[in-house]
Amino acid sequence: VQGRADKVAAQALLARVYLYLASSKASGAPGYDWVADADDMYALAAQYASDVLEGQTVYRLDPDLGNVYDVDHQADGVEHIFMTSMNREASGMEGTYSQLPQMFAIQTGNIVYISSSLAGGGEVMKFMNYESGFQVMRVDNEFRDTYDDADLRKQLMVTTIYNEDGSVLATYDPSNLTSSDNVKNKFFYPFCRKYTDPKSNSNRTSANLYLIRFAEVALTYAEAAGPTEEGYKWVNEVRKRAGLGALPEGLSVADFREAVIQERIKELAFEGHGIYELRRLNRADERHITNKAFKPTYAYFYPAPQREMDLNPQR
């Protein structure tokens, strides 16, 4: 049932938890001294991920990447193990419906049209049936450039917007920032199309948060198992769907895991994983804003409140 967790979702979440424990211990991330052995945690992560990958027949990788983010295909699709249940026709407070597309859409003052195909061109569709975007969630230009041009996931970052008749309205360019054109000067960075709803009810949409996808579990297994035959199999399945070739054979455990981590970054971008990935890999200090005060330990855990420590002196 959409919006509710089943046994497979529980197994998938356990796989994620054990992977985070393992990698946090292995990387020396603050706060994980209590974890006894990283290898034991990796083994448990692989075990629970394998239960999801091999022990059920409901979920699998959707061979069509576009379907994964098609708002009207998700509820009966095969990729999403656990996600929210938003409804564009719901009334009341936000939470029964979502405004996620607005967070990503550029603010042109008109309805934004994008290609209905990840390949670009052809028929166009509304990003959402509403005129205003918030431009809050922005794609970093340098991040987009880390994707191979053959990677279909690169097309999930919009670089061209259209008029309703299908003609090109504007193309992204960093130099657009200084343009006198009121559309172009909003389109100086690409924007993510993982959250669209062409049939939205004004700003009320059915766009969901993707809490656990089958692809994540495949990559969890690969990272936990390391460069085994099955580890290679699952990371390469995700890469194949994205239009890419297999990882090189013969990688060391460290190099293989790093390759899988880079795959996770590209596969799960804009789905709420970023800060947690930085924390578990002990890399939060690599991504802070350099002209702002930064306390490394606070990027991982806030200090325990003094009142709670006073009430629990043995903890």
Give the predicted meaning of each segment.
Residues 4-174:
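An aromatic- and glycine-enriched ligand-binding surface/loop that stacks and positions planar moieties
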Residues 63-65, 86, 158, 221, ...:
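Active-site proximal loops enriched in glycine and acidic residues that flank catalytic Cys/His/Asp
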Residues 17-21, 48-59, 220-227, 234-241, ...:
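Structured segments of extracytoplasmic/periplasmic soluble domains
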Residues 140-240:
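C-terminal substrate/ligand-recognition segments
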Residues 38, 42-45, 231, 235, ...:
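Amphipathic alpha-helical segments in well-structured domains
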Residues 70-119, 201-211, 225, 230, ...:
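Long, intrinsically disordered, low-complexity segments
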